[in-house]
């Protein structure tokens, strides 16, 4: 079991494809909680993921309920990245079995998902800034989680 990234009902294919490429390069899993705002596998998704999509481990869940059933059965902690988080991502103690959940680009996640999270983290931003692009935020959080857990590959570049 390894660190994983989950996208809650993603709106933008290119962001999801970019994150699929990131997890493929980092040896992680991507979970897509549907419905997505695009057909998974659409041209924008494939273009952003490039040929790395063949290497990506992507698991699709028909609903948040189905995702939660999987997560609880696996005994994994859900770490929600949110602008309402109380702990900065760099101050949070990640484990190698965490699932980091990113919300929809347009609306984040509903309150019920907030309540399901075991932890809520935030990327601190300058005053007046609302949020980062979800793909950038995901990459920053995964980088910190992998740094903390020693999860970066130790040999070569690919």
Swiss-Prot record:
The record's section on Pfam families has: SpoU_methylase (PF00588)
Signal sequence range: none
Give the main localization category: cytoplasm
- Annotated residues for binding of S-adenosyl-L-methionine: 103, 123, 131
| Localisation | Cytoplasm
One GO molecular function term of this record is: RNA binding
Q: Which domain of life is it from?
A: Bacteria
Q: Which UniProt keywords apply?
A: Cytoplasm, Methyltransferase, S-adenosyl-L-methionine, Transferase, tRNA processing
Enzyme Commission number(s) from the entry: 2.1.1.207
**GO terms classed as biological process:** wobble position ribose methylation
What EC class does the entry list? transferase
What are the record's GO terms for cellular component? cytoplasm
CDD domains under this entry? SpoU-like_TrmL
- Reactions catalysed according to its record: cytidine(34) in tRNA + S-adenosyl-L-methionine = 2'-O-methylcytidine(34) in tRNA + S-adenosyl-L-homocysteine + H(+); 5-carboxymethylaminomethyluridine(34) in tRNA(Leu) + S-adenosyl-L-methionine = 5-carboxymethylaminomethyl-2'-O-methyluridine(34) in tRNA(Leu) + S-adenosyl-L-homocysteine + H(+)
Subunit and interaction comment: Homodimer.
| Function noted in UniProt | Methylates the ribose at the nucleotide 34 wobble position in the two leucyl isoacceptors tRNA(Leu)(CmAA) and tRNA(Leu)(cmnm5UmAA). Catalyzes the methyl transfer from S-adenosyl-L-methionine to the 2'-OH of the wobble nucleotide.
Q: Which family does it belong to?
A: Belongs to the class IV-like SAM-binding methyltransferase superfamily. RNA methyltransferase TrmH family. TrmL subfamily.
Name by which UniProt lists this protein: tRNA (cytidine(34)-2'-O)-methyltransferase
């Amino acid at each position: 079991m390894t660190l994983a990234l989950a996208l809650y009902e993603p709106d933008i294919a290119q962001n999801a494809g970019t994150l699929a490429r990131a997890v493929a390069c980092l040896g992680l899993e991507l979970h897509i909680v549907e419905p997505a705002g695009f057909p998974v596998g659409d041209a924008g998704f494939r273009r952003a993921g490039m040929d790395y999509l063949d290497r990506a481990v992507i698991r699709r869940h028909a609903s948040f309920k189905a995702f939660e059933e999987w997560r609880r059965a696996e005994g994994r902690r859900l770490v929600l990245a949110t602008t309402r988080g109380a702990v900065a991502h760099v101050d949070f103690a990640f484990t190698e079995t965490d699932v980091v959940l990113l919300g929809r680009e347009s609306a984040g996640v509903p309150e019920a998902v907030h309540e399901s999270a075991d932890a809520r983290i935030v990327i601190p931003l300058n005053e007046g800034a609302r949020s980062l692009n979800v793909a950038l935020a995901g990459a920053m959080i995964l980088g910190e989680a992998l740094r903390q857990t020693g999860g970066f590959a130790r040999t070569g570049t690919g």
